Amino acid sequence: VQLPVSYDAKFRLLESFSPKTLSNDEAVAEWIGMFNIWPIKLTPGLICQGKASPQGNRLPVYRSITTPVLVIGFADDVVTPPHLGKEVADAIPGAQYLQIADTGHLGFLERPEVVNAAVLKFFASMGY
């Protein structure tokens, strides 16, 4: 079943953003407009991505990661809830976890200045 682009745009908005963004009528109109222009299409690449996604518990494998890691969770993410990011960070020895408020699944677009500052601070702490 192929749903209308306008329906898909509204659904994507609800699953992607925080209540704070969703309460801003101007932001909602802009994002719906953008999602209407760029609808999700079931391309071969997207289908392969879905098939390649790991289905099992990967946490035991994460315990062998030795590279410094920053896991960022978005507080209002309904697609990948922040507790799952925390679980990943807890599984990686020495990993840092940061939860960013007022952000949904696309938190890096909602609050890019906060996300970018966190990533830059992490890199700086590593000497980069």
Predicted regions and their residues:
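Conserved alpha/beta-hydrolase catalytic His-Asp/Glu region
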Residues: 7-61
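Short beta-strand/loop motif that positions the catalytic acidic residue
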Residues: 65, 71-73, 77
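Catalytic active-site module of serine/aspartate enzymes centered on a nucleophile-bearing elbow/loop
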Residues: 94-128
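Active-site acidic short loop of glycosyltransferases
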Residues: 66-67, 94
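Hydrophobic "lid"/C-terminal helical patch
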Residues: 12, 50, 88, 115, ...
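Flexible "cap/lid" loop of the alpha/beta hydrolase fold
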Residues: 1-4
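Residue-level signal for the nucleotide or nucleotide-sugar donor/cofactor binding architecture
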Residues: 41, 80, 110
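Conserved alpha/beta-hydrolase "acid-adjacent" motif
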Residues: 78-84
